[in-house]
């Protein structure tokens, strides 16, 4: 529980560092950070391995695009599997895409957390653009969007 208490202290300080609208703890291990214009990032702290997960809704996937995007998600997730970097996941509804980032909390400082958070928020912007633009994009445009995300530096989101 000592590691959870350290993480709670970090979360108590992080709002000011991030210039967040609010940081709210809902129960042991669960927080939400609100920033910008009602942007929400959820945080879950894993006591068993002293790590945390960031999650945010990236957008919706139209039914006709699901197969094509699912293949891309599998490829993207496989690249980040060993590095514990941002990966995509789909909600139970089948059309809502969540962006997740798993990170170690061991020896985590507020500066480390803010870097992880801002990198996550940056990738969220890219994913939202991809999902919004996908239905009307040409094959060439889709390829460029995939390359832009595939070439993101995975070390930017490592703890």
What do the predicted segments below correspond to?
Residues 10, 14, 66-75, 117-120:
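Short, Φ-rich (hydrophobic/aromatic) sequence segments
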Residues 85, 90-118, 122-139:
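Well-ordered alpha/beta subsegment
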Residues 31, 50-52, 95-97:
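Hydrophobic residues embedded in beta-strands of well-ordered beta-sheets
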Residues 27, 46-48, 93:
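Structural motif
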Residues 132-159:
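Short, highly charged C-terminal tails/helix-capping segments
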Residues 1-42:
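Charge-rich, low-complexity N-terminal segments
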Residues 58-96, 100:
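Short, internal acidic amphipathic alpha-helical interface segments
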Residues 42-45, 50-62:
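A short acidic-to-branched-hydrophobic micro-motif
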């Amino acid at each position: 529980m000592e590691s959870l208490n350290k993480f709670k202290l970090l979360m108590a300080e992080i709002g000011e560092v991030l210039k967040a609208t609010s940081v709210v703890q809902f129960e042991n291990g669960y927080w939400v950070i609100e920033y910008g214009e009602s942007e929400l990032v959820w945080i879950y702290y894993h006591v068993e391995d002293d790590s945390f997960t960031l999650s945010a809704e990236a957008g919706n996937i139209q039914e006709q695009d699901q197969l094509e995007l699912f293949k891309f998600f599998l490829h993207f997730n496989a690249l980040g599997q060993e590095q514990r970097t941002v990966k995509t996941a789909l909600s139970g509804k089948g059309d809502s895409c969540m962006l997740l980032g798993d990170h170690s909390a061991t020896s985590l400082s507020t500066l480390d957390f803010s870097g992880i958070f801002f990198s996550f928020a940056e990738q969220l912007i890219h994913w939202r653009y991809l999902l919004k633009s996908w239905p009307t994009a040409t094959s060439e445009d889709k390829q460029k969007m995939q390359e832009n995300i595939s070439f993101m530096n995975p070390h930017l989101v490592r703890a």
